[in-house]
Amino acid sequence: MTAFNSLFSLDKKRLKKLQRTLNTINSLKDQMATLSNEELQAKTTEFRKRLVNGETLDDICAEAFAVVREADKRVLGLFPYDVQVIGGLVLHQGNTAEMKTGEGKTLTATMPLYLNALEGKGAMLLTNNSYLAIRDAEEMGKVYRFLGLSVGVGVSDNEEEDRDAATKRAVYSSDIVYSTSSALGFDYLIDNLASSKSQKYMPKLHYAIVDEADAVLLDMAQTPLVISGSPRVQSNLYKIADELILSFEEQVDYYFDKEHQEVWIKNQGVREAERYFRIPHFYKQSNRELVRHLNLSLKAHKLFERGKDYVVDDGEIKLLDATNGRVLEGTKLQGGVHQAIEQKEHLNVTPESRAMASITYQNLFRMFTKLAGMTGTGKTAEKEFIEVYDMEVVRIPTNSPVRRIDYPDKIYTTLPEKIYATIEFVKQVHDTGQPILLVAGSVRMSELFSELLLLSGIPHSLLNAQSAVKEAQMIAEAGQKGAVTVATNMAGRGTDIKLGKGVSELGGLAVIGTERMKSQRMDLQLRGRSGRQGDIGFSQFFVSFEDDLMIESGPKWAQAYFRKNRDKVNPEKPKALGQRRFQKLFQQTQEASDGKGESARSQTIEFDSSVQLQREYVYRERNALINGESGHFSPRQIIDTVISSFIAYLDGEVEKEELIFEINRFIFDNMSYNLQGISKEMSLEEIKNYLFKIADEILREKHNLLGDSFGDFERTAALKAIDEAWIEEVDYLQQLRTVATARQTAQRNPVFEYHKEAYKSYNIMKKEIREQTFRNLLLSEVSFNENGDLQIYFI
């Protein structure tokens, strides 16, 4: 039995167990139907009482699902199918339900969300974009409110709206919250920058269902969510670095490996840089900023492609989501890469800002007590789901048989051949009136196909990053007779394509893929656009040896075949390669690409573990201070630790003749500007007591002035120190990762190098927090303004 078949054998066993619960739910159908609205609504109070009295969610699961099912029918006019109930049970168990496009994932989620919200700890559904979150909260929210639960929406249709803490607290205190993954991530980071209880709003992360789980939990897992703060000193090296890199010759001055997306300066390039800048030693410590900027410029030119990784819009670089081609509004690449791309495109170079806080989706979602996912394509990545999130992937049977035909790929030697063949095929299908969804792998390619269709006189809609606002509407209309829609991969996920009148008779929706994507899951998602709910349709992919997939992950023999045959073909007379070995080649290359993606995501987890441990430590200490609890940064403990450490330093490293100078310097830098005479004859114990006396006098004076506000002052002093040190640490760790990754070429383990340096930096950060808190407590000036508000001036 193959691994693929064994997965589905395992699914049968899982579904057999779920069938027993389904039978119980179905047996309650008539009973629920006889209840009045008031009696059905009263079930929510009953369930909550039963949970308080010791029953578990599993104990009330069948009855709760039956209640929601009946509520769905009364409120929405929709009664969940058996397969949707099974999907809901999978979600309640904290697993991923693989449900085909059009099978009703939105309705499926109502049952597990209601059940898990009954505990009063919150339940969330996280969608792919704000439009879907608002739409689903509005529609499904009617059911929850009917049953007495509150519903919050974590996003707004007004992108300019800046919600305050009170508004967000109201949202997150709701029984059920609809939001997006990115909104949740940024809210989490902002909440942990709060300096008082009144500014905090985020509850403990309890239960969440992630829509399009494979795209968010896997494909976007390496993308960090970053909150940027104060800018660095503006660099003038981007322009000069860009000028030099433009003069470099590939594989002579620098090495570029497209397959592994690696680029670095070779020895010849180093010599050119030394000659250009008139410096004797390129890698000397004093040249580190120059080296950094040259590497950034090299990355900007070779690793980031306009129309694929970003677009230029109104003089700004806007990043594209690799999974769907959408613009990532408000997102910038960190570490200077964004500025290097701006210089490459001859735009105004924006200030390079420091990262104040960051988190990856992986670490964000692993904080939930229970996590579930919905997707149309997750089965092939079940191993990774289990390893990273401890989530099984259960394939849910379709309510109606799938009637879509998936044709074998049409394979061509060159890109021009493939493009010509694709356009000719579109013409043939369009002549029949059958609607077409033509999917390109990048914004650049979608625009190219759009131009060629215009030249061919074929009217169509172009759906890519430039027109994301109309995305749902355009996708929804893509099934009308004669419609041709050109889209980027994954665009419109979450919106069904419904067939127009008479389209079934024409053969349903035709999905035409213009290249194999880097992951098999993406191709399956594209195919799944056609054939929803038993509709007829077909999918056909056109591929070539010049596609990104083959260039980046193809075997050497395939590259040799291309070089040998590329000049033998006529683009206007494309010839498809029919041999089985070529079909097998593209399948195996995609599997290799999937493996590389999984490996890269695994390395992200390894890298991010240091940041995660430090983040947890810092946030825990911040929350302890805000809540008035004692932590490692209790001001009283810090004074004792800092003074004791200084005395130990005097005892071990300072000569006797320098003793007075060191003590005075310590007092002046950390405690007071009023220096008093210190006798050379004082012992270290006497010096220690003397320093404690100074600290006690300063704090007593501030305590007398502040009275009941003294505790607020202590917390503020410590929080400010923590935040300053943590911002520096986050920024440093981001830079460190870039450096550590580069060390891989020097036969060093980049993860080991990173963790080693990160641990050193972590200890330095903790020491700096203690010392800065000490300074904040003693050197700060405090007073009350004319309104009676506490004012603190930190030196």
From Swiss-Prot:
It is a peripheral membrane protein. Pfam families: P-loop_SecA (PF21090), SecA_DEAD (PF07517), SecA_PP_bind (PF01043), SecA_SW (PF07516). GO terms for molecular function: ATP binding; protein-exporting ATPase activity. It catalyses: ATP + H2O + cellular proteinSide 1 = ADP + phosphate + cellular proteinSide 2. Keywords: ATP-binding, Cell membrane, Cytoplasm, Membrane, Nucleotide-binding, Protein transport, Translocase, Translocation, Transport. It is an enzyme of class 7 (translocase). GO terms for cellular component: cell envelope Sec protein transport complex; cytosol; plasma membrane. Belongs to the SecA family. This is Protein translocase subunit SecA 2. The lineage of its organism: Bacteria, Bacillati, Bacillota, Bacilli, Lactobacillales.
